[in-house]
From Swiss-Prot:
GO terms for biological process: bicarbonate transport. Disulfide bonds: none annotated. Changing residue 265 to A: Does not affect subcellular location at the cell membrane. Decreases ion selectivity. Residues 1-31, 83-238, 289-512 are cytoplasmic. Signal peptide: none annotated. This is Bestrophin-2. Keywords: Cell membrane, Chloride, Chloride channel, Ion channel, Ion transport, Membrane, Transmembrane, Transmembrane helix, Transport. It is found in: Cell membrane; Basolateral cell membrane. GO terms for molecular function: bicarbonate channel activity; chloride channel activity; intracellularly ligand-gated monoatomic ion channel activity; ligand-gated monoatomic anion channel activity; ligand-gated monoatomic cation channel activity. The chain crosses the membrane at residues 32-51, 61-82, 239-255, 275-288. It holds the Pfam family Bestrophin.
Amino acid sequence: MTVTYTARVAKARFGGFSKLLLLWRGSIYKLLWRELLCFLGLFMALSAAYRFVLTEEQKRYFEKLVLYCDRYASLIPVSFVLGFYVTLVVHRWWNQYLSMPLTDALMCVVVGTVHGHDERGRLYRRTLMRYAGLSGVLILRSVSTAVFKRFPTIDHVVEAGFMTREERKKFENLNSSYNKYWVPCVWFCNLAAQARREGRIRDNGAFKLLLEELNVFRSKCGMLFHYDWISVPLVYTQVVTIAVYSYFLACLIGRQFLDPAQGYKDHDLDLCVPIFTLLQFFFYAGWLKVAEQLINPFGEDDDDFETNFLIDRCFQVSMLAVDEMYDDLAMLEKDLYWDAAEARAPYTAATAFLMQQPSFQGSTFDITLAKEDMQFQRQDGLEAPLNEAHGDFLQRLLPVGTGMGTGGLLGRRVPLLRRKNSHVSEESMAASCACAGAPDGAVPECGCEGPLVDLGQPEPESEPITGPESPALVPAPRAPSEPLTVVPLSGTRGPAPPWLPSPIGEEEESLA
């Protein structure tokens, strides 16, 4: 039932998609022609009534109604609602196909883990795959109308060979009111455990791999059941349907051609068939039809999933793989390129031009650089000290205005930040350098006359000062130098920016 046109668009050419417009099976014309004819018929009926049935007074009232509907019909968000809805439906549609219970991976694990050339080993492998196929049939007949019509009862499943009569008795004797598609998976596990006890499955690793692959298969069956149970919320579908139908109901009236003699705006042309309105109906209503067809791909539409084909294919291929192909290997022999240094498959005359194309090495392999740009640079001295980097960064960020120049607030706050981000002050660093440079027993140049401090060891943390009030800051003794010159500020200092931390401002006030 799937419409496949992949071969028709294998090569992009002039009018490539145009040929697809002539297809009927699975086309939008097949889905929409009834609605399109109904809309066109109603439109023509209203147009004929306006022209030949209504009186002059009634025509004036109808014209006002047409202008009103045409003005406010655009308030309905048809494109917005339809876009999200169709995206949701298409994503759900593809995920449902990915949840189809295919047995290919499971049959490969069975043929590689369940061993035995005798009849019992063959019976184990075939029965395991038959249980997997039975579980797929049970879930598909629960969600697909096409599969249900093929297997309407359990008797039909038994007659088709997916279940024996003894298994049917055990299946029907299970006291459960829920869907029992999972029962064959449990039979699969029990039979695999029995094969492990008999040594048909040689180790626990292979047994674990077999059960893990079965759980993947069973989870896909469960996902199909949940997709069938949990639909797209009904309110969403109702909103989209009402939006589309109400919009085109308003277009039936609002898109009517009025008498040009009345002088209405944008009504200078009098036609009978609304061409662009029909195109708009074709696109929007067709968009809704796409969602209507894809919302349940397990029906009998032209583009629904080929569930019966998948059942037949999986059953035949799985039985062939675990039975006739078990341990069936061709004789090992050297390949054609055994002695070749470079293995390269030949090309036909139609594809010989591909041999001339260079292999792709990466998008950067064609980039060329100048010789001076390829010289390595020394890393010495490229990184500035941390405190200087902080200062430069703040110099770029802080605004400069009245009272905030180099000698104003900015010049006072940056040294404070440097002192707060360092372990010692600048004066202490200078004194430490002087003390460190003094010889043993000599008086340091800093004049502190204290014991020399080893700068290699971290200073012990000072204990917090307890008391009702903290002592005032006492400046360190300064070495004799030139007298200080006090330079008054060029203006009043402005208020501190609100983004600066308050402790910095408080420390500045105490220092002032």
